[in-house]
C-alpha cells in the first residue's frame, strides 16, 4: 500500500550535457535514464517499477519462509504497440529459488500462494497499471 510519504516525495529530472537524463528525489535517490546504450529508457523504468514493486511486496512472504536475504527474481516484459505508442500489456515472471530449503510440494504451493497474495494486495504499481490512470500535465515556459 502507498504510504503518505510516497505521495509527498518530490521527484524531478534534469538533462545532462551528453544527452542522458538524471532522475532525483528530495531524499537523495538517483537514477540515469535516456535513449541509447547503458541507460534505462522510460519504458524500461515502467517495467522496473512493476518488478520492483512485486519484489518489495513479496519480500516478507519469501523471507518468512526461506530466510532473511532471500528474494524473488522478477522478469518483466511488455507488448509495445507502435500505433498507439503505448504498452498494451505486461508479463511478469516471479521466480523464487527455494532449492536450498527443500520444501515439500505442499509448502512450495503455500509459498506460491502467499507470494501471489502479497503482490496482489501490496503492489501499488500493479494496481495503478491495471486501471486506466489519468495523467494531468501542465507546461510552463519561464522567460
Show the residue positions of the predicted features.
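Alpha-helical metal-binding/catalytic segments enriched in His/Glu/Asp
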Residues: 53-54
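Extended beta-strand/beta-hairpin segments
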Residues: 5-48, 59-143
Amino acid at each position: 500500500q502507498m504510504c503518505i510519504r510516497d505521495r509527498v516525495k518530490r521527484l524531478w529530472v534534469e538533462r545532462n550535457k551528453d544527452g542522458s537524463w538524471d532522475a532525483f528525489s528530495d531524499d537523495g535517490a538517483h537514477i540515469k535514464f535516456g535513449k541509447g546504450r547503458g541507460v534505462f529508457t522510460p519504458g524500461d523504468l515502467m517495467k522496473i517499477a512493476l518488478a520492483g514493486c512485486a519484489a518489495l511486496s513479496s519480500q516478507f512472504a519469501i523471507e518468512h519462509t526461506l530466510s532473511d536475504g532471500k528474494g524473488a527474481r522478477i522478469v518483466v516484459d511488455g507488448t509495445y504497440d507502435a500505433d498507439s505508442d503505448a504498452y498494451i500489456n505486461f508479463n511478469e515472471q516471479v521466480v523464487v529459488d527455494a532449492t536450498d530449503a527443500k520444501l515439500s510440494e505442499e509448502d512450495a504451493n503455500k509459498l506460491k500462494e502467499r507470494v501471489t497474495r502479497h503482490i496482489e494486495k501490496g503492489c501499488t504499481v500493479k494496481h495503478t497499471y491495471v486501471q486506466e490512470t489519468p495523467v494531468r500535465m501542465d507546461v510552463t515556459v519561464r522567460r
